[in-house]
Amino acid sequence: MNTQQLAKLRSIVPEMRRVRHIHFVGIGGAGMGGIAEVLANEGYQISGSDLAPNPVTQQLMNLGATIYFNHRPENVRDASVVVVSSAISADNPEIVAAHEARIPVIRRAEMLAELMRFRHGIAIAGTHGKTTTTAMVSSIYAEAGLDPTFVNGGLVKAAGVHARLGHGRYLIAEADESDASFLHLQPMVAIVTNIEADHMDTYQGDFENLKQTFINFLHNLPFYGRAVMCVDDPVIRELLPRVGRQTTTYGFSEDADVRVEDYQQIGPQGHFTLLRQDKEPMRVTLNAPGRHNALNAAAAVAVATEEGIDDEAILRALESFQGTGRRFDFLGEFPLEPVNGKSGTAMLVDDYGHHPTEVDATIKAARAGWPDKNLVMLFQPHRFTRTRDLYDDFANVLTQVDTLLMLEVYPAGEAPIPGADSRSLCRTIRGRGKIDPILVPDPAQVAEMLAPVLTGNDLILVQGAGNIGKIARSLAEIKLKPQTPEEAQHD
């Protein structure tokens, strides 16, 4: 970036010129790392800490950031401001040290709000679909030559990054409701994909509180802003009269302003028509499977249409859409002869979905695109509280696959809850008489326990939000083949 470009960008947030050094606690998270990446590209000195290296920290180090793989008071020395992830507790030694040194400590969303303050902000919120919809909006705006800045919670595969600094006036960002911090944002346009009971500890277990928080988020829009909302979602339909802003609805529903019609899935692609008010019907080929992704695309098209983006640019972006990391992410198709001696192949797909609605959407997309495949799922429940609160929903959804292997619950810092563990969930599913789930007590045993259930015409879904993504990549690297002790030691 040349000096003139940097000066222009730094002038966007003039008061932040006083800030030189920004330190992130929990910098390895996708949302944190994305903001750090944008700020690094704006010329700020970036440092951060996390417990282990990952692709996010490597990308930031490539940009010149200093990363500590520990949490120590001296890490915040000389920082102008400390940005914290919602996963970081208040007694973290870096946060304590920052308070003692009178260094401002702010949440991730507060920093995102500052980036958005002097740009045309587009924020994407909702229980499910935020990451993919953010990537679709970003792809359309980039295809239209608008050079947006984007900050996403997942890897935008076409760009190879979670975030990118553009020179245009638009900032497109995923808005996180998990800790209610999206209330810091003041966008010009807000998408809400759906609203379900999740992260209920933030909302004192009160769903009405969660719904009101979404309304408060939408009230951050100026009176001339716009809310784009999925009318198929019953909670959104209920809340529409309370929004108090200009709205555009989308969905399969007949009364949607942007309506999805004639949906058909062929392999990994969706084909459908979008009907828009005062516009010609748009026949879409979307390079992403599932009806849920057609809805995500409809939201992106609604925003782009309102902005006056040319239909041809929209269609090009959707047809060439490369998706996001760990969202129905195709990792390869492998011959089974070396795995278990059988002929044929197995496809391997990695997916982040960890709520029953998300898991259900992934299963439906797999069934629609590959109806003749033996559907095998390796599932890792995420958080004991979520497993407890949505126990019956998980049991119902997971019976839809042909074979289920289940890892232990990924705790994400939570203490175990009796009856909300993987063994109990397997027992409940088995009792329903449709499938006989297999508990995998040790991640190192995954390949060994997976091999016998593969038939030679399989689609393997590796599903969950914990460390299961690493397991998926490991399975791809070894091409599903169980490793001998010598091979495992060599790896």
Swiss-Prot record:
GO terms for cellular component: cytoplasm. ATP binds at G126, T127, H128, G129, K130, T131, T132. It comes from the Bacteria. The keyword Ligase applies. It is found in: Cytoplasm. Pathway: Cell wall biogenesis; peptidoglycan biosynthesis. It catalyses: UDP-N-acetyl-alpha-D-muramate + L-alanine + ATP = UDP-N-acetyl-alpha-D-muramoyl-L-alanine + ADP + phosphate + H(+). One of its GO terms (biological process) is peptidoglycan biosynthetic process. This is UDP-N-acetylmuramate--L-alanine ligase. The lineage of its organism: Bacteria, Pseudomonadati, Pseudomonadota, Gammaproteobacteria, Enterobacterales. The gene is murC.
